[in-house]
Amino acid sequence: MLSRTFTLSILPLTISALLLTACQKTEQKTEVAPAASATTNASAVTASAPAAVDMSKETAEYKAWVQTQIDSLLADTQKFVALLEAGKLEEAKALYPKARMYFERSEPIAESFGDLDPRIDNREADLEPNEVWTGFHAIEKILWTQNTTKGTEKLGKQLIADVKELHAKIPTAEVTGDLMVQGSVDLLNEVSTSKITGEEEIFSHTDLYDFKANIEGAEKIFAILKPKIQAKNPALVTELEQKFGAVNQLLAKHQVGQQDYKSYKELTPADTKALAEAVNKLGEPLAQMGIVLQ
């Protein structure tokens, strides 16, 4: 974990408290305090909503978008592994964070398939005793700590097999409005718990790519839900556009060229503090997107 001289104040987010309060106040605008837990599941949200809302158009659009992301994930993973097999170390390192962005944008659906998520994306720090480590981060460690592609052969083949399995399962995913709203919140929690701290890409320090991808994933959900949010709370749309804009402007300061980002080690404590504060300010209005479920 990278050393930081400030304490993050980002709290994990949830949408249940916001929806419960809204249901209790049918004709009164209610100011809701920031949430403090991300443990809410879809059933809790559904139980708090007063009536079912037709989200079929939105869920179909989101599922189709995630499919395009996983299509690209598979294509880039195959290119990445081909580079590993060819011993092209620097080219593999360059493609590694870009390939991962497709997965990071899609996590609300990608992580719903049992142990596929950890097989593809597990960090060394999250391994259980005697658990076999596979996936992107196992390869990352070899590339950046040993500075070689040797030893990645078996891991590369397994990674392609796992990504192919994920690709095949996306059409079977059950996508609901609950999953979309909570998924956007969970993506922000991902940023606040591992990307901001530099723990996600601890060997390559390519955390800003993951950070950007998580924000893009949450912003895509917002874009799809925007017409429904606009109909119920136009001010919330304006606030979310401003808050997403603020985060993206800060990330743009650390962009290199059209597609790359600085090493996370190059960021100062002031840089990471500014990013943390911008993410924190986005958190509560993002959770309020749950109004579309009412």
Where are these regions (language model features)?
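Bacterial N-terminal signal peptides that target proteins for export
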Residues: M1-L11
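Bacterial signal peptide processing site
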Residues: C23-T26
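Long, low-complexity, intrinsically disordered regions
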Residues: E31-A42
